[in-house]
């Protein structure tokens, strides 16, 4: 049986990044991560195949994130740089440039419609098309179509900026 501690150790940073794709506010993002962890903990006994843990966890994460977005609809947003972008770095100019590019990408991903945001965040977490399909309840072909459309939209958004 997989423990919650193992899930957090293996997927904690990925869960934080997924939450960051849906929530800018740090406190609400942290609440979302906690909500995801509680949901995973409650669902772990129903996991039949431990080899499918990754898509199992990510499906729960995305379902909770979608519910969170629905609850927060209409809430005024706050601009806060993602924790994953607060990285002291090499030379200050390069670090600033990298952070600005990463911030633009994060903001562009946040502007994607929900179906495209879901697949892109899972692609960024290195899930295969098959794992994404399983996590989101889609066909592999539909995942491919959504990824291509999301990439095209991101490219357009980033080239306009």
Language-model features and meaning:
Residues 110, 114, 125-142, 156:
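Helix-turn-helix DNA-binding module
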Residues 1-17, 27-30, 41:
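A short, charge-rich alpha-helical start-of-domain segment used by transcription regulators
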Residues 7, 11, 15, 36, ...:
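Residue-level preference for hydrophobic side chains embedded in well-ordered alpha helices
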């Amino acid at each position: 049986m997989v423990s919650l501690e193992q899930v957090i150790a293996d997927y904690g940073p990925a869960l934080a990044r997924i939450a960051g794709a849906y929530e800018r506010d740090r406190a609400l993002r942290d609440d979302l991560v906690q909500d995801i962890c509680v949901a995973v903990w409650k669902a772990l006994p129903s996991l039949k195949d431990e080899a499918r843990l990754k898509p199992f966890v990510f499906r729960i994460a995305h379902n909770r994130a979608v519910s969170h977005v629905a609850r927060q609809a209409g809430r005024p947003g706050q601009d806060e740089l993602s924790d994953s972008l607060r990285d002291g770095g090499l030379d200050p100019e390069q670090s600033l440039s990298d952070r600005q590019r990463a911030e633009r990408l994060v903001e562009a991903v946040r502007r994607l419609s929900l179906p495209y945001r879901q697949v892109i965040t899972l692609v960024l977490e290195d899930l295969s098309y098959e794992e994404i399909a399983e996590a989101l309840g889609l066909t592999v072909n539909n995942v491919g179509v959504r990824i291509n459309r999301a990439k095209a939209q991101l490219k357009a958004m980033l080239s306009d900026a």
